[in-house]
Amino acid sequence: MKTQTKDKIFDTALDLFSKKGYDSVSVRTIASEVGIKESSIYNHYSSKKDILMSILNYFEEYFK
């Protein structure tokens, strides 16, 4: 279940960042879209920047 939630956070953040821009999206917005409490995000990522770095690392590996 923990991995599923982390994947949902990742996918939702990627979608929101690409549609609205990183600076326009809050952790609260991501959590709301995922359907979890904002504090629950921090069980998976330390910050919004950590989510972004995870996304960037994923694509860096994908395009190698």
Positions of predicted regions on the chain:
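The short coil/loop that forms the "turn" connecting the two helices of the helix-turn-helix
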Residues: 4-5, 36
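Alpha-helical structural segments
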Residues: 8-15, 19, 33, 50-64
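Conserved hydrophobic/aromatic packing and binding residues within compact polymer-binding modules
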Residues: 9, 30, 41
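Short helix/strand-capping hinge loops at secondary-structure junctions
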Residues: 16-25, 29, 45
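Short hydrophobic/aromatic patch on the recognition helix
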Residues: 35-45
